[in-house]
């Protein structure tokens, strides 16, 4: 696999550990939700998302009901766009207050910097909201890496397991699918990307997946333990 024209990467389990997201970010947002909803429910950036949650779930528009729904979604790792938007707003204060810094694997940091230096456009596609993605890379333990990226995509462009989402991303960045490499730890996402012609790499880190994965469709993708093994 030669140097691609563009690289699209996932975050959780790919550039960064699953444990940081599940053991630090998710619990932080869960704890903060009651106060956040009470204090910001009328804010113009917050109200549309709360309205969406209430309308889609038939939940009475009360603080308690909304918080309970959102906390349940956190517990079940829902990828709902409204939840991700609200989580991103909550994490803003956590990053700014120094309550935590984002984890990045050293091999990912090294390769991201090298690709940027080689003028390869880098993009993020994550279920987390675009503002949350930008916060993540701006407040990482490796420093502010947000400037390495040329663009950001979240589920407002479509679900990560839907091939049409990757078609939209390719059209947005103006590069044919065959010129893009997508890096992820989720096989279903890689299958969707491969379906429309993206080159795909399964990142199968031992820190996140102690037993190497040899599941259905694994062999459809380049299967590596880390960014250090990438051939470009």
Curated annotation (Swiss-Prot):
Function: Bifunctional enzyme that catalyzes the enolization of 2,3-diketo-5-methylthiopentyl-1-phosphate (DK-MTP-1-P) into the intermediate 2-hydroxy-3-keto-5-methylthiopentenyl-1-phosphate (HK-MTPenyl-1-P), which is then dephosphorylated to form the acireductone 1,2-dihydroxy-3-keto-5-methylthiopentene (DHK-MTPene).
Co-factor remark: Binds 1 Mg(2+) ion per subunit.
HAMAP family named among the record's database cross-references: Salvage_MtnC (MF_01681)
Record keywords, A-Z: Amino-acid biosynthesis, Hydrolase, Magnesium, Metal-binding, Methionine biosynthesis
PANTHER family in alphabetical order: ENOLASE-PHOSPHATASE E1 (PTHR20371:SF1)
Originating gene: mtnC
Record's protein name: Enolase-phosphatase E1
Subunit description: Monomer.
Cofactor field: Mg(2+)
InterPro entries cross-referenced by the UniProt entry: Enolase-ppase_E1 (IPR023943), HAD-like_sf (IPR036412), HAD-SF_hydro_IA (IPR006439), HAD_sf (IPR023214)
GO biological process: L-methionine salvage from methylthioadenosine
CDD domains: HAD_EP (cd01629)
Keyword flag GTP-binding: no
Pathway the protein acts in: Amino-acid biosynthesis; L-methionine biosynthesis via salvage pathway; L-methionine from S-methyl-5-thio-alpha-D-ribose 1-phosphate: step 3/6; Amino-acid biosynthesis; L-methionine biosynthesis via salvage pathway; L-methionine from S-methyl-5-thio-alpha-D-ribose 1-phosphate: step 4/6
The keyword Repressor is annotated on this UniProt entry: no
GO molecular function: 2,3-diketo-5-methylthiopentyl-1-phosphate enolase activity; 2-hydroxy-3-keto-5-methylthiopentenyl-1-phosphate phosphatase activity; acireductone synthase activity; magnesium ion binding
Family: Belongs to the HAD-like hydrolase superfamily. MasA/MtnC family.
Reactions listed under catalytic activity: 5-methylsulfanyl-2,3-dioxopentyl phosphate + H2O = 1,2-dihydroxy-5-(methylsulfanyl)pent-1-en-3-one + phosphate
Pfam family, one: Hydrolase
EC number(s) reported in the record: 3.1.3.77
């Amino acid at each position: 696999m030669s140097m691609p024209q563009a690289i699209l990467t996932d975050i959780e389990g790919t550039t960064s550990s699953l444990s940081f997201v599940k053991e630090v970010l998710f619990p932080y947002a869960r704890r903060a939700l009651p106060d956040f909803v009470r204090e910001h429910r009328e804010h113009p950036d917050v109200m549309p998302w709360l309205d969406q949650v209430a309308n889609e779930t038939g939940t009475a528009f009360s603080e308690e009901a909304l918080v309970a729904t959102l906390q349940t979604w956190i517990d079940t790792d829902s990828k709902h766009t409204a939840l991700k938007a609200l989580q991103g707003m909550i994490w803003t204060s956590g990053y700014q207050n120094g309550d935590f810094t984002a984890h990045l694997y050293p091999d990912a940091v090294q390769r991201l910097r090298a690709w940027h230096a080689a003028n390869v456009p880098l993009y993020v596609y994550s279920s987390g909201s675009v503002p949350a993605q930008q916060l993540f890379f701006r407040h990482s333990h490796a420093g502010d890496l947000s400037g390495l990226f040329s663009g950001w995509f979240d589920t407002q462009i479509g679900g990560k397991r839907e091939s049409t989402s990757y078609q939209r991303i390719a059209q947005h960045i103006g590069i044919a699918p065959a010129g893009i490499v997508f890096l992820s730890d989720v096989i279903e996402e890689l299958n969707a990307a491969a379906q429309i012609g993206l080159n795909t790499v399964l990142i199968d880190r031992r820190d996140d997946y102690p037993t190497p994965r040899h599941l259905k469709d694994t062999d459809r993708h380049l299967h590596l333990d880390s960014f250090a093994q990438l051939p470009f």
